[in-house]
Amino acid sequence: IILKALEEGCYINFIISEGEETGCVGIKKLEDNKTLATFIDESQFCIVLDRRGNDDMLSSGGGTIFCSTLAQSLCNFTGQDFKVTSGSISDTCTLCHYCESVNMSVAYDNPHTANEVTDFKRLKEIKDHVIGIVTEFSHYSTPTHIYSKTTYSSRDWREYYGY
């Protein structure tokens, strides 16, 4: 997807990391040596292209909230071709501390098995969505301390209103 976007003249910053499945070691190395903050400082938002399936737009994962507003805005932009949901640990858990981030399905199933399969027809559609997002999507970013740090459980709500 990234190479095709570059071939089509899109201007994008990208990170290729390793070891996401073993604790996000690659992205954490970038974070530890302060490279990550510098690299994504000018980025309006981040889309992690590493989610199994065909139609997930993750707004949270591994107990970390990424950005539900960005996830829903991207779903709307793609014509509801995706659905907002949650997942497990990913590099997005780290990236969301630096800019609004989501994790997007990229048309594969049965990851890391002998039965891993890619739906190339759907992958092309997703590539077209990503290029559309890069070239046409307008999003006004919110500082990360505003969107990701406050969560409310139903219990908090009841206590606040005296129930």
Task: Go through each PLM region and give its residues.
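Generic secondary-structure signature for well-ordered alpha-helical cores
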Residues: E7, Y11, D32, N76-G79, ...
